[in-house]
Amino acid sequence: MADNTGTDNKGTGCSGWFLVEAIVDRKTGEEISDDEDETVEDSGLDMVDFIDDRCITHNSLEAQALLNEQEADAHYAAVQDLKRKYLGSPYVSPLGHIEQSVECDISPRLNAIQLSRKPKKVKRRLFQSREITDSGYGHTEVEVEAATQVERHGEPENGCGGGGHGRDKEGEGQVHTEVHTESEIEHHTGTTRVLELLKCKDIRATLHGKFKQCYGLSFTDLIRQFKSNKTTCEDWVVAAFGVHHSVSEAFEKLIQPLTIYRHIQWLTNEWGMLLLVLLRFKVNKNRCTVARTLATLLNIPEDHMLIEPPKIQSSVAALYWFRTSLSNASIVTGETPEWIARQTIVEHGLADSQFKLTEMVQWAYDNDYCDECDIAFEYAKRADFDSNAKAFLNSNCQAKYVKDCATMCKHYKNAEMKKMTMNQWIKHRSKKIDETGNWKPIVQFLRHQNIEFISFLSKLKLWLQGTPKKNCIAIVGPPDTGKSMFCMSLIKFLGGTVISYVNSSSHFWLQPLCNTKVALLDDATHSCWGYMDTYMRNLLDGNPMSIDRKHKSLALIKCPPLLVTSNIDITTEEKYKYLYSRVTVFKFPNPFPFDRNGNAVYELCDANWKCFFARLSASLDIQDSEDEDDGDTSQAFRCVPGTVVRTV
């Protein structure tokens, strides 16, 4: 037992025993209600004066309004403290205010201790708003010229918040300034900076200025402007402002299925994440499509982006993308666009040379381009992979080069044609046709017109050889008998030219006969036959004749084989009796047949004419000689100087 030494008056005083008397109103096992005390008798006295029906005076109204305003301000201040404590800003990086954050974390009052008075800095506020907003990381700035400092207990405190990082602590003295209205307080946080800035009148000018401030160069140095939003392009440069940092981490994977090349640069500023990206899409897109796509991926409005195609002809722009792709500030995936490689890679730079007209002429000759418009258009499309075509586009004399190229190509083609015989020319024209064809539709059509095929072959043989008095064949008959269709298909296969009497008022209407193997005069009327009977008898004979040429001297030529179509049968006209012996006439009396679908029954195409001349070459005396059976051993024409190959 414990020692009780020193204890007096056992059982008495504060250390003694005490009695507790309990009053039990219910017996064991009786249910107890969960409601309020059932024993209390409700007399209704507690509801007396529940409704304040006293007379309201003017002074009480003002007091109540003041109380409501003070309670609203207190609630608002509590909510703002919670926001600054728990919410993060999606627009502003914490690095934007690192200096001020460190000061406030070390000591909330350290920033207020000043040994000398700081000069007032005049700041020009371009964009202001009267809204009270908060983003968490942003600063709450009171719109006054100087910060109001209030001393309490001998310690000065700054009136501005520390960027949302400094918070009041319990037990410390707090300064409660007077409640300012919304018109006197502006909260310029990261969110409000973006929203206020982008609500200004000229958004594009603001975005261009911010881009130049962040990257140190103008956005227009990298792009060329498209005035229309519907113009499509394969490559696009996009600058996006106010992107959330969580989106920036996943953007590369989100954009990958849509593009084949991506050059991504991220930069953090006071607005948040700034994106600069060069994209090459799998298909051509216009500005509206690109804006909708990126607005969905980046979760920003479309007017927060600058979207333009890149400068593909600027070496400065190409060098910028090339140099930045080598740094760790860029994320580059995919094959480098050819316009960047062409202007930056050493091999491409060495391949660039001055324009050579001979290479352009050789290309036009090999591809049978003699028209200026075709030469200009087709050669310009080769600039992506042909250095000479690129030099052609960079030249200021493109029109002159195109004209000279077409002229030289025509000279080479005419010289080549005049050097060939008719047999060689038909063989040359047949090589340009890949299809085999069938010769029977041509024979069937001649039989349909009641023309003896053997007689037609004998006349055609003399016509191809240019025999005097047999140098002109006339196809006559009623309309819609297939005269023009038959002759046009033959002239097209032989690469001939077509002359028209409608130009007879000009002295030069016969000039095309100087540079052709065969010719066609379509739809000769009485006036045309009369002109031929008066002035062109020597021409129809196949004898030499002088032809007037524009800007050139007269040319003495032998008329090429000539086809004439007409609705007039000159063999029945007495006045054309001097043409009877000079013109071979074939009559087409029957209409040209068509099936019920409107297609020609007898197909007269180049492939069928190729088969026709190949099948009947022996009858037409155009068969290759024995020396030519082994193929053409002559070298292809070259107008570009070659290099001498030294043999070992």
Swiss-Prot record:
Subcellular compartments: Host nucleus
Keyword ATP-binding: yes
Span list, region Disordered: 153-188
The protein's name: Replication protein E1
UniProt-annotated stretches for the region DNA-binding region: 186-352
GO biological process: DNA replication
Principal location class: host cell
EC top class named in words: isomerase
